[in-house]
Amino acid sequence: DPSLNDYTAKILADNKKCGSHDFLYRGLAHMWGADWSNISAKGMLDMDKELEDFINDEKDPGDFENYLIVPPFSQAEILKRTFEPLFSEVKLNTRVTEINYGSKEIIVKDQLGQSHSADAVIITIPLAILKKGTVKFTPTLPQKKREAIEKLQMTPGGKVFIKFKKNLWGDTWSFQNDGFIVMYLITGYHQEPEKNTVVEGFVMGQEAEIFVKASKEKQRELLKQDLQAFFGAEAFEENYEDHFYFGWESQEDIGGAYSFPSVADAADCRKALRETVDKKLYFAGEATDCNGYSQTVSGALYSGKRAAEELMKDFE
């Protein structure tokens, strides 16, 4: 099961090409939330195939043109507007510590020591937290599901946002370079030029571990080394205002960026992870998506819809 790194090296060697474009594959890995040495080439190709199978209408690939989201509307705002009646039922800052599904009635315990009963539970716990085992399942989850949790990976990662005094890139929407951060996107691409002044960089895997430990000045220097290749060191110095990094690994209840295909049978692992247990436990979350949208908010939302539909069908 070769990694994306090994696979790329073999392809280049077989075609007698130099590795000058290796960074493109490394950047692809960063978008997938990991270092390219940790991504299974087969697992990644299988996910691409899933997406092709799911979107089989070339003229209308997923109706994306109907769902363009631009500021000031965030994804959170869209959720609030769509599901506003349910928000009063959401209990925040209440971490679940145990799920006992050994009897007909399921008992869910939280960090405050309170117990909640239900006939069924939809579980959206992030993969990294499932791997830590901080939520106790009684009885233990089926072996196939535990093996899937062990095989799938979710490592540190996040995004850095760099604000400039003015737009230095015109209508360009992305930068790719063989630097510390390979992939940069323009967050204000759909905005007017005068509002389009922020660049977003994917910081994943080893780079995320380095970046989060660096001082802000050292982070700024790393960003300068990358971005000066596109609009020069002087322009960077004259127009840089500030930058902000957010890594999901810093969030105690999330623990990482998002899942990625770390093994050749990653698709089978995601199918095992999403399987219902005894018509009691229903699993959702981006890591359970099998339509090529794992690692995305879209995949997470779709998985929640799928789990809810499975539950309703079982309780008809």
Language model regions located:
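FAD-dinucleotide binding site
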Residues: 1-316
